[in-house]
Each structure stands twice: as structure tokens, then as C-alpha cells.
């Protein structure tokens, strides 16, 4: 066993659109983490720095204790608090793995798989652009693609019929183009009411989507259960949830077929391992939410590698800058699968020079409908 050590300092980096952290130990071990939700990295950075005062001088191995102390001291919760706690949790697990010279998944029960099936984001403002991107990704080896079936100006449709017809046409075109060898995942992004999403879901049944994601706002598990009951397609939801308690309500309501915890928001590796176990008891599989940097991807793969009820991994592509610049050696992607790394901790190393890249902050851009009202994105 390595000699005991203490946390020396915590560093934060606003890198492009993401928040990365490093936790330094007195013995020289450095843990890497990522936290926050897209668009709110600055306040999450401030929260990490606030929590760092407590962490300095503490034993990094007491991961659950530090989470509980900080969580209970916060009084008021939410995405900023949980984003900071998630970043810290991931970095502390990275430290533990590095100090013990084993991958994180070895510390969480051991490996359940050697590679992780990914679904790739595809898009296009026109139907032809969407189809072309889906075909391109299928040719690259991906066996699942995910897309929004609406144009970017979806909120300017004059009628529900026009909106739904366009969605059905786009989903059908993608399915026909990629064939039975590629699963399609339909993302609604909470842009519909329960009634609208039920009617659209029924029309999409013919295309056998792998999942129907966030067909309405996730705030009401009871209403989400209505959508699940009245559509003969699997619902996937949960990316906005920050605690195990929200997932418990969702699962108790039988409101989803897949859960989508975000490791950088829902308590890090510790929190999402708990969520996965809760879902396992309901025979529900896990599709981790992953719209952030390669650090988030690496954390997701560690979780995917040690749970029995993994289904798919969200993947947005990391072969082009700035993402391709962040790691010394990127995770191996082959035929739409990420290889589970064997290195200690997260199994990655940051390219220190890349951390100099400036922040690219999100601009608030809520869409406005024809009547002047704000729309969900």
C-alpha cells in the first residue's frame, strides 16, 4: 500500500466550453476531473474553489466522506453544487486508482466488458444533410446514431401537424438510409408537451427506435410515465437529474426504459454507480449522458466497464480540435466501440500545453417562437 498523503491544492481550468479540475496531493499524485453542465461552467468553477478550502489537507482516499460533508454543508442543492461535487469525485477516484496503480473500474467491482458500444451524434439542417451525416457515421463503423428530428428553427413551425410530419419524414429517411444494422436514437430535447410527444411517439413506432429521449420536460415522473405507457417505444431520460433521489422517483414511477445519468452532474462516479445499481433492480439499463470533454468520456468508460446493466455510451466525436488536443493519447475508438483502457485511474493523461486554450463561454440563446414566448431547447 502507498504511504498516506494529503490534498495539497485544487486547480480549476475553464477550457474551451468545459470545466476541468486537478487535485494535487503532497506525494505528487494529480487527479483529473470534470464537472458542470454546458453553459454554467463559470459558477461551477467558483463552487469548486469554495469547496477546495475544505479539501486542502484532507486524505484523498475518503471519497464518500468528502462528498457527504460537502453535500450536507451546502444546504441548498442544484446543478452548480452537484457539478462541483462531481468534478471532485472523479478527480479523487483518479487519485485512488493512480496511487494503487489500477483502473477505477477495478476498484468498483472489476471489469464487466472490454469495450463500450457508442452512439454518435449526427445532424443537419435539412433532411438530406441529416441522412448524409448518418450514412457517413455508419460507414465509420458506428452501429447506433442519435439525432433530433427537427430543423434548427423547429420553434417557428406554424402548426403541430407540420412539425410532427417533418419529424416522421426525417426519422424514416435516416432509418431507410442506414438500414437494420444501425440503431436510431431519437432526441426530442424536451421540446414537446406530453400530449404532443405521445402522438409523435406513436407515429415513430414503425421505425423501431432504440430510444425516444426526453420527449417532455423531466420534472414530472408521473407525466413521463404517461408518455411511456402510451408510446410503444423505449423512453430515455435523466440527463438533468443531479441526485440519486430524483432517479428514485423516476424509477418508482416506471417512467422510463433507460436512465441517462451525467457523471459530471450527478455525483461523479460514486453517484452514478449508485444510480446504476438502483436501475439494475428494475431491469433498466444505463446510457450515460456525455456532451462534455474527453475527460467526461474517460470517466463514463470507467463506469460502463464495471456495471452489468450498461446499454450505450453517448459520444460526440473527439478526433478534431479542440477535443483532439486535450489528451496525450486519446481513448481508442474502433468500429463504433471505445476500448476500455488498462492504465491507472481514468487511464488518461492531459496534454498540459492544451490547457492554455482560452474559454469559449456559452452565449444564452433561448429560442423565441412566433408569439414572442420562450421555447424549450
Each model region followed by its residue ranges:
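Metal-dependent enolase-superfamily TIM-barrel catalytic cores that perform enediolate-based chemistry
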Residues: 115-231
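Extended hydrophobic packing segments that form well-structured cores
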Residues: 346-377
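Metal- or metallocofactor-binding catalytic centers and their adjacent structured scaffolds
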Residues: 24-100
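Conserved, mostly hydrophobic/aromatic
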Residues: 7, 28, 51, 88, ...
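Short glycine-enriched loops at secondary-structure junctions
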Residues: 16, 190-192, 217, 240-243
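Shared catalytic-loop signature of beta/alpha-barrel
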Residues: 49-53, 62-65, 202, 208-211, ...
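Glycine-rich, aromatic-flanked loop segments that form ligand/cofactor-binding clefts
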Residues: 89-125, 129
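Structured beta-strand/loop patches that form or line metal/cofactor-binding pockets in enzymes
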Residues: 1-32, 36, 318-324, 373, ...
Amino acid at each position: 500500500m502507498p504511504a498516506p498523503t494529503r490534498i495539497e491544492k485544487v486547480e480549476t481550468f475553464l477550457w474551451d466550453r468545459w470545466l476541468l479540475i486537478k487535485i494535487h496531493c503532497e506525494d505528487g499524485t494529480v487527479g483529473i476531473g470534470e464537472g458542470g453542465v454546458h453553459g454554467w461552467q463559470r459558477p461551477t468553477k467558483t463552487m469548486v474553489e469554495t469547496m477546495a478550502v475544505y479539501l486542502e489537507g484532507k486524505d484523498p482516499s475518503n471519497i464518500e466522506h468528502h462528498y457527504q460533508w460537502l453535500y450536507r454543508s451546502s444546504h441548498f442543492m442544484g446543478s452548480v453544487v452537484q457539478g462541483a461535487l462531481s468534478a471532485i469525485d472523479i478527480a479523487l477516484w483518479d487519485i485512488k486508482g493512480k496511487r494503487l496503480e489500477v483502473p477505477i473500474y477495478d476498484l468498483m467491482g472489476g471489469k464487466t466488458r472490454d469495450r463500450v458500444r457508442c452512439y454518435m451524434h449526427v445532424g443537419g439542417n435539412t433532411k438530406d444533410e441529416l441522412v448524409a451525416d448518418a450514412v457517413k457515421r455508419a460507414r465509420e463503423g458506428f452501429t447506433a446514431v442519435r439525432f433530433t428530428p427537427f430543423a434548427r428553427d423547429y420553434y417557428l413551425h406554424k402548426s403541430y401537424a407540420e412539425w410532427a410530419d417533418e419529424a416522421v419524414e426525417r426519422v424514416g429517411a435516416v432509418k431507410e438510409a442506414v438500414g437494420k444494422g444501425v440503431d436510431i436514437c431519437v432526441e426530442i430535447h424536451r421540446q414537446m408537451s406530453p400530449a404532443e410527444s405521445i402522438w409523435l411517439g406513436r407515429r415513430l413506432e414503425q421505425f423501431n427506435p432504440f430510444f425516444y429521449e426526453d420527449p417532455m420536460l423531466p420534472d414530472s415522473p408521473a407525466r413521463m410515465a404517461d408518455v411511456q405507457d402510451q408510446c410503444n417505444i423505449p423512453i430515455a431520460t435523466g440527463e438533468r437529474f443531479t441526485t440519486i433521489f430524483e432517479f428514485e422517483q423516476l424509477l418508482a414511477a416506471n417512467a422510463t426504459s433507460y436512465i441517462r445519468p451525467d457523471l459530471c452532474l450527478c455525483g461523479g462516479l460514486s453517484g452514478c454507480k449508485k444510480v446504476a445499481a438502483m436501475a439494475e433492480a428494475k431491469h433498466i439499463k444505463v446510457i450515460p449522458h456525455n456532451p462534455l470533454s474527453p475527460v467526461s468520456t474517460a470517466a463514463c468508460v470507467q463506469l460502463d466497464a464495471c456495471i452489468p446493466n450498461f446499454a450505450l455510451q453517448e459520444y460526440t466525436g473527439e478526433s478534431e480540435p479542440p477535443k483532439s488536443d486535450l489528451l496525450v493519447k486519446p481513448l481508442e475508438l474502433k468500429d463504433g466501440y471505445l476500448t476500455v483502457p488498462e492504465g491507472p485511474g481514468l487511464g488518461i493523461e492531459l496534454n498540459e500545453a492544451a490547457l492554455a486554450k482560452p474559454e469559449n463561454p456559452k452565449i444564452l440563446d433561448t429560442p423565441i417562437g412566433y408569439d414572442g414566448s420562450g421555447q424549450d431547447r
